[in-house]
A protein has these predicted regions:
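Conserved histidines in hydrophobic membrane contexts and catalytic metal-binding motifs
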Residues: 1-401
């Protein structure tokens, strides 16, 4: 068993180790993505706070203001109706309108899709700037989006997302094989040896012990990071497994029940309907219906939600009569739905507040540490075997002489 586990552990490390290092390091930076993005791009993402509020204060945006921003964009021939509109969460933030590629445009599987982001000042309705989300670059405006697309897509579109999912699945196998290799005999001395790290005057020995003991100690966190990463990129791989253990509610697309293309409510009415359903929630994003018969999709964050930022509450609003068609409420989730709703807050660390985010940002260096210590250990063993093989060959040549 250990021989097979050793081979699996070795080859996964050699094949996917570099990708895991890249994902870990980019994840460390993305733990503070929005904060760093604002620091790098103050003119694009920060404006003067509304009267009576200090920069950074939490704020709720009135439906009338959302309607005013949407109307301004529709009237301007440079923009038109956006696909989604992100609302400012704090005083000093901007609206972010997104425009996806035209419906007829087809991206190659390895091509990174590009979305146009337009930022709007809530107070003046002035466009502060725009950028193409998905384009790569190291400029101040493109640095954080580039890191995001490396982390999620390896800058290779849908094909890169599959590679990331396979890498996450390989990490799960690495954890399992590593635990098999770590497992000591049930004796006090061997258990203590498996749980301690000593230098002993040898760096290769230190690297081996650090790799072995450290791997055991961080295995639970690595497991959560790997499983959640696979779920974010390929949910169809994870959801059936979770559903087999605990029921997961099927995701059915909502359809308007009343009215037609000619009868269409405004976005402000959709926001009002969502706020009436969750009076204490804060609207964070609204998706506009691409066709007249499709509903609005409003995203909110409720006060007690684990997920920070945009939250995970979703409300489908009939675009013909403003009735609520469907609700996804993470605070009422049960079983498999509850488990899946926990994955993102655990992956980012925000489930445990600021301390959790700091921990995850530091944890992003763990793959680099394991790749380095594992490589040092393997090279030492490989070199030792090569020398032993060379000595055996020379000995046989001497015997024949």
């Amino acid at each position: 068993m250990k021989k097979i586990a050793r081979a699996v552990h070795l080859w996964i490390g050699l094949l996917f180790g570099t990708i895991l290092v890249v994902l870990g390091l980019t994840g460390s930076a993305l733990s503070w993505m929005h904060e760093l993005d604002k620091i790098l791009n103050p003119g694009l993402l920060q404006v003067v706070a509304p009267h009576g509020l200090y920069p950074g204060d939490s704020m709720r945006v009135a439906p009338a203001l959302v309607q005013s921003v949407a109307d301004m964009l529709v009237r301007d021939p440079r923009y038109g109706q956006p696909n989604t509109l992100g609302l400012p969460a704090r005083a000093g933030d901007v609206f972010v309108a997104t425009y996806r590629s035209s419906p007829g445009h087809v991206e190659a599987p390895w091509t990174q899709a590009v979305t146009r982001h337009v930022m709007v000042d809530p107070a003046t309705l002035r466009v502060t700037g725009e950028r193409n989300w998905g384009e790569l670059g190291l400029s101040r405006a493109m640095l954080m989006p580039t890191l995001f697309h490396i982390h999620r897509y390896l800058v290779a579109g849908e094909m890169g997302k599959v590679v990331v999912a396979i890498t996450g699945a390989s990490l799960l196998l690495t954890i399992l094989s590593g635990l098999i290799l770590w497992w000591p005999r049930m004796a006090r001395s061997t258990i203590w040896k498996a749980l301690t790290v000593r230098h002993g005057g040898s760096w290769p020995r230190f690297c081996y012990q650090l790799h072995r003991t450290g791997g055991f100690l961080v295995a639970p966190v690595l497991f959560v990071m790997a499983l959640s990463g696979v779920y974010f990129t390929m949910p169809q791989w994870v959801t059936p497994v979770v559903n087999a253990i605990s029921p997961v509610t099927p995701k059915n697309k909502s359809v308007n029940h009343g009215g037609g293309p000619a009868e269409h409510i405004l976005v402000g009415a959709a926001i009002t309907a969502a706020q009436q359903r969750f009076p204490n929630g804060r609207v964070t994003r609204v998706s506009f219906p691409p066709k007249g018969v499709d509903p609005f999709e409003v995203r909110m964050r409720q006060p007690a939600e684990l997920r920070q930022g945009p939250g995970a509450t979703r409300i489908s609003i009939d675009s013909g009569n403003a009735r609520v068609l469907g609700v996804v409420d993470p605070q009422q989730a049960r079983g498999g739905d509850k488990f899946l709703s926990w994955l993102f807050p655990l992956h980012t660390g925000e489930a445990f507040g600021l301390a959790g985010r700091i921990f995850i940002s530091l944890f992003g260096f763990v793959p680099l540490a394991f790749f380095t210590t594992g490589l040092v250990t393997w090279l030492k063993l490989h070199r030792g075997r090569s020398v032993a093989y060379k000595n055996r060959v020379e000995y046989r040549q001497i015997e024949r002489a």
